[in-house]
Amino acid sequence: MDTRLLVVLLPVATAAAWALFNIGRLALQQLKRMS
């Protein structure tokens, strides 16, 4: 594993995980509101 590749992928992975977390949280709020 190249260290430079890891340095590039880490922020991208963090941003993707954060986005998915926020989308999931909002989706749960919408589902609770609907039911």
From Swiss-Prot:
Mind telling me what this protein is named?
Photosystem II reaction center protein Y
The job of this chain, per UniProt, is described as:
Loosely associated component of the core of photosystem II (PSII), it is not always seen in crystals. PSII is a light-driven water plastoquinone oxidoreductase, using light energy to abstract electrons from H(2)O, generating a proton gradient subsequently used for ATP formation.
Which biological process annotations from GO are given for this protein?
photosynthesis
| NCBIfam families membership | PRK13240.1 (NF009711)
GO terms under cellular component: chloroplast thylakoid membrane; photosystem II
Q: Which residues lie on this side of the membrane: Stromal?
A: 24-35
**Which terms are listed as keywords in the entry?**
Chloroplast, Membrane, Photosynthesis, Photosystem II, Plastid, Thylakoid, Transmembrane, Transmembrane helix
Where does this one sit in the cell? Plastid, Chloroplast thylakoid membrane
Native organism is Emiliania huxleyi (Coccolithophore)
Which regions of this chain are Lumenal-facing, per the record's topological domains? 1-4
Family indicated by similarity: Belongs to the PsbY family.
